[in-house]
A protein has these predicted regions:
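Catalytic domains of riboflavin
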Residues: 1-358
């Protein structure tokens, strides 16, 4: 069973190795991760012994530019767009670069802000990976998880990661990963838990405008929001205020250009009539394909990662908009049944799901 984020961060900040597992519909695999600044030869030897031996070092875009670490290939065709740079060794070590001591030294040098591009030989035995800005909130991969763990622990944002393997050469998955973490007394966390932790503690939206607009049921108060992840504004429309913020009838709207143009008016009128009957209501309009907070069901095709990452962001953006409006619990007006996860982390409760029939 995964440990709490707080337990993992405490262990990570003290230089311990931790195990991080991603989603089953992505890879379902576990990586050993340690902060590069605290990586010792002993920890590197443990990593090499229990993993594929391909040791990677997640870094930020800023550090990659500073150290002139160019992409390994011009056109990335990997299944999960893992951003490999050219491989490196640390020149001052002077050896082949393959030993645990030399690889640990190279990783520590990557985390040293005083190190420069000329301190590293190319190619080498450490494989830097460029993490997406925004971390696990933008890409739910081990690369981003490693950098996020460093940042959340107050350490230089460079990690060391490698994928856990069984003795027969197969990749560890699921319960195998959990048993490994338990047998070696390593803290274990999922990327999903890291996403939820960040969402509940970071401000993902900013109110940028307030306005009033007319509607068939009377004036609506509009609130426009921006997030770091979207170029366009999200909007919430409030009918008759939210009062004490409890049991507020709420509709999350998923934009669909064709539907909204040709059949959307009837649906919106029905939503507004429900608001009028209830006496108050909130319509959260998350643009650019955002639907609100549904996490399941998810698309089954391999391209689902982008959809899943977007939906994780919607959990935070949609919930934080409600929180900004003073809403603490909602009656969810929905035309389909979803599994809504993540709202409770923002102090928002779904009291009921009420069917929207058009």
């Amino acid at each position: 069973m995964p440990d709490t984020i707080q337990e993992v961060l405490q262990a990570f900040a003290s230089g311990e190795l931790v195990v991080v597992t991603d989603d089953e519909d992505r890879e379902g695999e576990g990586d050993l991760i340690v902060a590069a600044s605290l990586c010792t030869p002993e920890k590197m030897a443990f990593i090499i012994r229990h993993t594929s031996g391909i040791v990677c070092a997640p870094i930020t875009t800023e550090d990659a530019r500073r150290l002139r670490l160019d992409p390994m290939v011009a056109h990335n065709e990997s299944n999960h767009t893992t951003a490999f740079t050219v491989s490196i060794d640390y020149k001052p070590d002077g050896g082949t670069g393959i030993s645990a001591e030399e690889r640990a030294s190279c990783c520590r040098a990557l985390a040293n802000p005083n190190a420069g591009a000329n301190d590293f030989a190319r190619p080498g035995h450490i494989f830097p990976l460029i993490a997406r800005d925004g971390g696990v909130l933008l890409r739910s991969g081990h690369t981003e998880a490693a950098v996020d763990l460093c940042k959340l622990s107050g350490l230089p944002p460079v990690g060391v990661i490698s994928e856990l393997m069984n003795d027969d050469g197969t990749v560890m998955k699921g319960e195998q990963v959990a048993r490994f973490a338990s047998s070696h007394k390593l803290k274990h966390v999922t990327i999903a838990d890291m996403i939820a932790y960040r969402q509940a503690r970071e401000k993902l939206i900013e109110r940028v405008a307030t306005f009033t607009t007319d509607s068939p049921i009377g004036p609506l108060q509009g609130y426009a929001y921006r997030s770091p992840f979207d170029e366009i504004a999200h909007v919430a429309f409030v009918y008759n205020g939210v009062g004490d913020g409890k049991n507020v009838l709420t509709r999350f709207h998923k934009p669909n250009i064709v539907r909204d143009i040709f059949t959307g008016q009837k649906r919106m009128l029905t939503v507004l009539e429900h608001f009028k009957k209830s006496g108050r209501g909130v319509l959260v309009y998350l643009r650019d394909g955002a639907a609100g907070v549904p996490v399941a069901p998810l698309p089954q095709e391999k391209s689902a990662e982008a959809d899943r990452n977007r939906q994780w962001r919607e959990v935070g953006v949609g919930a934080q908009i409600l929180r900004d409006l003073g809403v603490t619990s909602i009656r969810h007006l929905t035309s389909s049944v979803h599994d809504y996860k993540g709202l409770s982390g923002f102090g928002i409760e779904i009291v009921s799901n009420e069917q929207l029939e058009v």
